[in-house]
Amino acid sequence: MKLYDLKAQGLDLQENIPLSRYTFTQTGGPAEYLAFPKTLAELKELLAAAKEDQLPITVIGNASNLIIRDKGIKGLVIILTEMKEIKVEADKVHAQAGARIIDTSFAAGEAGLSGLEFAAGIPGSVGGAVFMNAGAYGGETKDCLESATVVTRDGEVKTYTNAELHFSYRHSLLQENDEIVIAATFALKAGDKATILDQMNYLNALRSYKQPLEYPSCGSVFKRPTGHFVGPMLIKAGLQGKQIGGAQVSTKHAGFIVNKGGATATDYLNLIHYIQKTIKEKDGIALQTEVRIIGEE
């Protein structure tokens, strides 16, 4: 079965859709084909159809820590945000990949379960959090993830334990293969609901105070080099406020690049490269991007 057969059967398949509608930077070129599967069965059908059509497949979640180049993405783009069910069972939380990690964290808190407080201000999806071992305020996804369920490009469903995912700083095994996170289980500890929710609300308030949430951005742009913090490095190098096109190193938090209006992905990438070049020259440090960069060059 091919993609157009699925469309004829009622699956919502869109063509030539600007991905800037979905990215947190509000930049990015078009998807040749775009689909939002609601179930694992639909996702499997899309994978099989794209394979039949010999189309490349790109899977994304909430697009919060992502830059899509201005030429867009060829083939089929699958956005998982409609696969967003969250269930709490005893001391575990089960969440589909498209669920927001914020919502998953608050579901745990409302159930009096502790361990996901750190994620209360992370805007990404559960799948994205597992994929990159997302973290904040001293916590990381690996600290409480019990297992992750994935589907291969051939439609095989597999489950990995925490240890099998080989987590490290902003990294997991899933960055090295083509498998797609479809769900995750978090093993948490019973705690005092009010205390847990207070901590989550505090971290959210801290995020609002420190981060430039008033502008579109892709979140933290660079990985933290050992022994350094990115924001202070950029300030010391005179880069805070540096702007190329509509992309600017935030004047509120130099670790963020914001869209001040009309920015393109190329503006973002040119500013990233300028920052990397400047820091390499001044400090001898090669900054690595935390943000995922995809699309046609």
Curated annotation (Swiss-Prot):
SUPFAM superfamilies named in the record: FAD-binding/transporter-associated domain-like (SSF56176), Uridine diphospho-N-Acetylenolpyruvylglucosamine reductase, MurB, C-terminal domain (SSF56194)
Keyword ATP-binding in annotation: no
GO terms for MF: FAD binding; UDP-N-acetylmuramate dehydrogenase activity
PROSITE patterns reported in the protein's UniProt record: FAD_PCMH
Leader sequence residues: none
UniProt pathway annotation: Cell wall biogenesis; peptidoglycan biosynthesis
Catalytic function, reaction form: UDP-N-acetyl-alpha-D-muramate + NADP(+) = UDP-N-acetyl-3-O-(1-carboxyvinyl)-alpha-D-glucosamine + NADPH + H(+)
Gene3D superfamilies xrefs: 3.30.465.10, UDP-N-acetylenolpyruvoylglucosamine reductase, C-terminal domain, Uridine Diphospho-n-acetylenolpyruvylglucosamine Reductase, domain 2
Primary location group: cytoplasm
Active site: 170, 220 (proton donor), 290
PANTHER family named among the record's database cross-references: UDP-N-ACETYLENOLPYRUVOYLGLUCOSAMINE REDUCTASE
Name listed for the protein in its UniProt record: UDP-N-acetylenolpyruvoylglucosamine reductase
Lineage per the UniProt record: Bacteria, Bacillati, Bacillota, Bacilli, Lactobacillales
Gene field: murB
